[in-house]
């Protein structure tokens, strides 16, 4: 669910932001009419140290990063290894560190953990991990236990390594086939990939599927998120970029990165990397 704004300023003319209707408010917890957002759990959050896109030597390792509002990092449980212990969804919250929403679970033994919130999960729902869990959104189990055709997310690449695949807003993979020791998944990119049947995955799609419809409306909103401007290479001097300099505009060069490497179409995958787990390429 998204909301548009009246074009009373240039910054609001194109602005489209999420309505956050799925999120739990302070009023819901306290029994009031407050619509204010929740603060994260103190024991599961800490302030991130901003790197400004620099590495340990102070060199820029990632361009166009810096500034922005200070962010609290929420510790999310990607392993989902508390088997057989039911957990109740206490809250569904916003997370500035990812496109999806997160849900705070309270387990029967008193422990609390954040997980990626699947689509449709609500406050008060009950989820559980491990074999024999129900096939409903938020429950986690190994791939060999999941029926064919079911949508999954937060998928491990190796058993017990924690979810690595399909974690962004609105994504889901589909269980396509099973063979001795392996399960074939159709990834959101269209790629068919085989994974060990002992890898865990969570049932359902990732929440906030309309994330791609968001329009920030102005450069300042991107700056609040720590994104700095991108300068075109043709607008630079020759000392700064291979595309720089020249009398007027010219287009007689092969597109290159600021470090002189050919880009736009050049294959970057390591030729020695194994493709035996990829059943079908996403581009075919």
From Swiss-Prot:
The keyword Transferase does not apply. Residues 232-284 are annotated as: Disordered. Keywords: Ribonucleoprotein, Ribosomal protein, RNA-binding, rRNA-binding. GO terms for molecular function: rRNA binding; structural constituent of ribosome; transferase activity. One of its GO terms (biological process) is cytoplasmic translation. Residues 240-250 have a biased composition (Basic and acidic residues). The keyword Cell cycle does not apply. GO terms for cellular component: large ribosomal subunit. One of the primary rRNA binding proteins. Required for association of the 30S and 50S subunits to form the 70S ribosome, for tRNA binding and peptide bond formation. It has been suggested to have peptidyltransferase activity; this is somewhat controversial. Makes several contacts with the 16S rRNA in the 70S ribosome. Belongs to the universal ribosomal protein uL2 family. Part of the 50S ribosomal subunit. Forms a bridge to the 30S subunit in the 70S ribosome. NCBIfam families: rplB_bact. This is Large ribosomal subunit protein uL2. It comes from Chlamydia pneumoniae.
